[in-house]
Amino acid sequence: ESIVKMQNWDKRADKESEAAGMYLLTYHYIFDKLNLGTEAFIEGMDVDNNLFIEAVAYANDHLMEYFETLDVTLGELQVHVRGDKEYGVNGFADVLAANYNMPYTNGKFKTFVADSYVQFAQWKDGELSIESLHPYGASNREWSEHYNDQMELYVNQETKKMTLDKEEIYANAEKIYHPK
C-alpha cells in the first residue's frame, strides 16, 4: 500500500500529501543508513530495491507507532515550531522554498533551516507595492507578541503588506520610541 502510494505521488512536498509524509520518512531512513548528506540531492544516489523496501517498512512502523495509521500527511509529520505554536509545513530539502528538519517529539520532525526574511517589491504605474514575511516573527524576545506572529502566514505561503511611507508608518505604529 505504501509503495503504491509513493508510486502514484505527484512529487509535490505539500503539507496535505500523505505520500510526501511517507517519502520524508523513507528518505530519512536511507540517508541515515548510507550516511549521506545534502550533496546526495545534487549528485544522485543508487538505492537498491532491498534498501528501499527496508526504508518503506521503517516508515510504516514509524507511522503506526506514533500515529496508529499509515494515512498521515506531511503537515502532520513535519512541523514549524516556535514557542507554543506548531504548524504543519510544506517542503523538503531539495525543493523550491526548501527546508531541513530533524526529529522533534511524538514521531514528528521540526524544521530548523528554511527560508529567512522574504520581501517582494513591485513598481506599477509609479506606485510601489511591498509584501514581506518572516518565518517566525519580527522579534527574538519570547515575551513579545511578534515572537511567532507570522508563522501561520509562512506555512500558508502568504505575505503581509508593508510600507516605507513614513506618515503611514507613524499613523499605524503600535508604539513610537527611540532605541538607546
Region spans (language model):
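Acidic, low-complexity N-terminal propeptides/linkers enriched in Ser/Thr/Asp/Gly that mediate export
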Residues: E1-K180
